[in-house]
Amino acid sequence: MADLLRDDIGLTGTKIGCSIGVCGACSILVDGTLMSGCLLPAIMVDGRSVTTIEGIAPSESELSPLQDAFIKKGGFQCGICTSGQIIAATALLAQNAKPTREEIKEWMMGNLCRCTGYYKIIDSIEAAAGIDRANV
C-alpha cells in the first residue's frame, strides 16, 4: 500500500523506512485503524477509508492539532518518522483523548525515531491532547 500511495497516487508523506512493518514510518489509518502501509496489500483496502498524513489536517491552510503541536514542541528533527508518528498519535487520541504519559509511550512503541530521543514526541502528543504536565 505504501508504494501505491507514494508512486502511483503521489501521496509522498507516507514514508518507507524498513519495509518490514517495524519502524512505523509507513503508518496509515484504514477505517480509523492504525496499520503499517508497507505490509498492507492495496487490495485489502478496496472500498475502505484510507487516511495518510496528507488527510489529517482540517484544510490545506490549517494544521491538525498534532501537526501544530509537533512544530511548537519540536517533536521532529530529520522528518523521516514524523508522518508515521503523527498518524499513530492521531489513532491514539481518537481512542483515548487524555492518555497518560505511560499510555503514550506504550502506544508509540511501534514508531521508531533515531533523532529526538522521544521526549519531544511525547510532549507534542500531550500538548495536542491539552495535557499540561506542569499542572498534573
Annotate each language-model stretch with its function:
Residues A2-V136:
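Signature of N-terminal electron-transfer/Fe-S-associated modules in redox systems
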